Amino acid sequence: MGRYVIAVGGTGSKVLEAIVYAACADAFSAPGEGPLPALDLLSVDVDASCGNTTRVKRAAEAYEEARAALAASPYDHPCFHTRLSIVRWSMNLSRRAASVSQMAARHALDGLLARTLFTATEASLEYSEGFRGHPDLGVLFFADLLGALEDMRAQGQPDELNAMVDRMRADLDRGETVQIGRAHV
C-alpha cells in the first residue's frame, strides 16, 4: 500500500517535521502489522528560503541515516523502521510569473479576477518569497502550474509532483491501495 503526504507551505513543512519525529518512535504502525514500511513525502513551498522546509529536510536526512544504521545492525530495535522519502517540489519557478500581477497580465480573465480579489500590494508580492500568510494569493499560481503538468510530462521535463503521481499510479496498477494525506493551512 502506498502512503503519501503532500505538505503545502511553511506550516505544511512543520507538519512534515512532526511526521519525521513521530516516525522515530514508530508512531505509524498498523494494528497487527507493525510499523509502516514507507512514507512518501512531498513538500510544496514556493518560498525557496523557508526555514521550515530546510529544517524538515535536515531532520529527514538525519532520520534516514539513523534508520539505515539500525537496519544494518544485527540487533533488534524498537524504532526507526519506516523508510521516509522526502522531496521538495521545485515547480520550475524560473519559468513562471514572479507575482500575481505578472501572471494576471498574461490572461485577461485572470487579470480581472486578480484586480477584484487582491490589493495592488498583495498582487505585487513575489512568489519566490512565499505567500506571506495569504494562501489565497497562490490560487492563480497553482491553477496555472497544475494546468501545465501534463505539458511538462509530454516534453519530458522532470517534475517531482508528476513523479509522485506516477508512483501512485504504479501502486494502483499493482492492485494496491493508495492513501494520501495533506498538510496545509
Where would I find each of the regions flagged by the language model?
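Conserved small/polar residues in nucleotide/adenosyl-binding loops
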Residues: 183-185
